């Protein structure tokens, strides 16, 4: 089976969104369609944020996608790639499609001086965990934490008064 791996642009929004929703449902990731669509639009129109790719058969049928965004981390010497999504439709898995995507993404990063690629795997997704480990990813001894930025009035903490002894 011949598979192509090509960069996406704004014209790919509809197909990519369909694949992203399929991936989020498969991996049990909660989502709001409007939020995904808005974020995807931003990514596809602003390549300084990252890059999306489409995985297609030789008949131009979309069978998966990948999204790499950029993060800055001193620990890794500057810009690192964050592989936020890599999805291959079920009937095309175990055929080297994911490996092709990772190979191309690693080349993309190397060409841009990005020395590290980070990703997250859902605890229940054992096949993804096994796949990524087999390609050289390693588990860090850390927890992932996130904070959704809230409006000022909904914050549980109040701003400390400058000059006060804590």
Residue ranges and their predicted role:
Residues 133-142:
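Conserved acetyl-CoA-binding loop of GNAT-fold acetyltransferases
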Residues 88, 94-107, 130-134:
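Conserved acetyl-CoA-binding loop-helix of GNAT-fold acetyltransferases
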Residues 79, 95, 112-115:
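Short coil/turn segments at alpha/beta junctions that flank glycine-rich nucleotide-binding fingerprints
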């Amino acid at each position: 089976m011949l598979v192509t791996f090509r960069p996406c642009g704004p014209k790919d929004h509809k197909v990519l969104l369909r694949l992203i929703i399929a991936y989020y449902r498969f991996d049990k990731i909660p989502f709001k369609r409007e939020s995904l669509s808005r974020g995807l639009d931003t990514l596809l129109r602003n390549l300084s944020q990252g890059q999306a790719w489409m995985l297609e058969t030789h008949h131009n049928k979309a069978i998966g996608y990948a999204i790499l965004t950029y993060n800055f981390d001193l620990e890794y010497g500057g810009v690192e790639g964050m592989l936020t999504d890599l999805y291959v439709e079920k009937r095309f898995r175990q055929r080297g499609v994911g490996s092709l995507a990772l190979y191309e993404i690693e080349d993309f990063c190397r060409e841009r001086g990005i020395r590290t690629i980070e990703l997250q795997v859902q605890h229940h997704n054992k096949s993804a965990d096994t796949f990524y480990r087999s390609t050289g990813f390693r588990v860090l001894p850390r927890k992932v934490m996130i904070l959704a930025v809230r409006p000022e009035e909904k914050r549980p903490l109040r701003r400390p008064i400058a000059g006060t002894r804590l």
